[in-house]
Amino acid sequence: MKSITVIVETPRYTAGKYVYDQEKNIYMLKKILPLGMYFPYDFGMIENTLAEDGDPADAMILTECITYPGVHISCRLIGALQAKQRENGKEIRNDRYMMVAEDSLLYGHIKKIKDFSKEHNNQLKEFFINYGEVEKKELTDLRFSDVEMAKKDLVKLTT
C-alpha cells in the first residue's frame, strides 16, 4: 500500500476535539475533554474513506512535529486499534488506524504496533475507553490488528 494521506483534525496534547464541517468548510471545536485528559497523538481522518459511522476513517498519527487542524500528512500504516461502538442501540465498528508520518525521524523505526511496549498499548486502549465514556459511546472488544489486517479493512472503506 502506498502512502496514505491523513488530514489532522485534533493535534496531540490538546484537550479540545475538533471536527471538520464539510458544509461550512471549516474546523469546529466539538468537545472539550475533562481536566487532565488530552489526545495522546494527532488524530485525523483518512482521505477518500467512509467508515461505518458515516465519517471518514479515523487515524492516529505519530510525528514529532507540531501540527494543527487541516494539515495533510503523508503516512505509513502500522496497524489499527479495532473497536466496536454502541451508539443509540446500534453496534458498529469504529477502528482507529495507526500511522507514522513518512518523514518522521523519531518514529520512523516503528513498523508495526508490536514495536510499542505492552504498557503503551494498554494505556492507548484505556484512553479510548475513557474517551468513549466522555462521548457517551460504549467501546467494546478493543484489540490491535497487524498491518496486513488493517490494510484489508481500510481497503473496504475506500470510496
Role assignments for model-derived ranges:
Residues M1-T159:
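Hydrophobic N-terminal alpha-helices or hydrophobic patches in metabolic proteins across all domains
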